């Protein structure tokens, strides 16, 4: 499927080394002020060539809107857009045309479709996620009207991780480091590790934490449309994602109800909770507390080291990849996680609004 969402929907198209990546957004509310500078800023956070710890591929990543906008506002009709690819080095993939990269989508795409575009991974490339960042930026602008804010950050790279919870850090510092970690000391250690891994032609994974504040009570559609299930689905569609947990996640298995339950209390006329182990979601429905979750990313499959593999004829061979690749996806994946979160929350907010007049 190339379409995400129920009411607020994105259909993306394009390949890594094709002419461009684009999309069509349907179901966007009319009248949203389209802050093009903000949208470009979001794309810049994701684009390649940002620092020594990202891919050296250089792209302008400037979005061109084709429809659905008049005098700077959304019209409620489909929003078409495209971002042109300008810096492809397709010859870097000549030695991969008939060879499968270990842990990459090469083999599964070839087997499923009987054909694949080997240049940069084609449709399986994370280059596709730029379309999500456009749709996510517009979703953020819509959510801003409801006081909903989303902030993601790198909380772990390999064995190096932040201690404590998101509440222990000033998340406004996230964008001040190349790795997008809000703690300067830990960020420096992460960047050093990524640079070391890159120098050896290897890659490394990690974890991104995301927090959504200001989400009202009531978003989520039991029983098969639970909000945490929707967020999990959204995250697991992102390239290289291998795990998702919200609230206290797997740690919930180690505690008794008397230890873990989020107790309610009257907070000056408002219902609040003493703790937030549930991660802002109970029974699949938002409860008004901060929604927070973690997303685990594997190391990038394409490494510049010799690997045992097979070719399309099933013959054993050795592959040493070439090209420009991220040694760690985390720095550029932070805005992607935020975008998928924004799209999901706006979608579920619009679903909830269909109930208000009944």
Curated annotation (Swiss-Prot):
It comes from the Bacteria. Its EC number is 4.2.3.5. NADP(+) binds at residues 46, 52. CDD domains: Chorismate_synthase. Transmembrane segments: none annotated. It catalyses: 5-O-(1-carboxyvinyl)-3-phosphoshikimate = chorismate + phosphate. Its cofactor is FMNH2. GO terms for biological process: amino acid biosynthetic process; aromatic amino acid family biosynthetic process; chorismate biosynthetic process. GO terms for molecular function: chorismate synthase activity; FMN binding. Pathway: Metabolic intermediate biosynthesis; chorismate biosynthesis; chorismate from D-erythrose 4-phosphate and phosphoenolpyruvate: step 7/7. FMN binds at residues 123-125, 239-240, 283, 298-302, 324. InterPro entries: Chorismate_synth, Chorismate_synth_AroC_sf, Chorismate_synthase_CS. Keywords: Amino-acid biosynthesis, Aromatic amino acid biosynthesis, FAD, Flavoprotein, FMN, Lyase, NADP. Reduced FMN (FMNH(2)). SUPFAM superfamilies: Chorismate synthase, AroC. One of its GO terms (cellular component) is cytosol. Homotetramer. Belongs to the chorismate synthase family. PANTHER family: CHORISMATE SYNTHASE (PTHR21085:SF0). This reaction introduces a second double bond into the aromatic ring system. This is Chorismate synthase. It comes from Parabacteroides distasonis (strain ATCC 8503 / DSM 20701 / CIP 104284 / JCM 5825 / NCTC 11152).
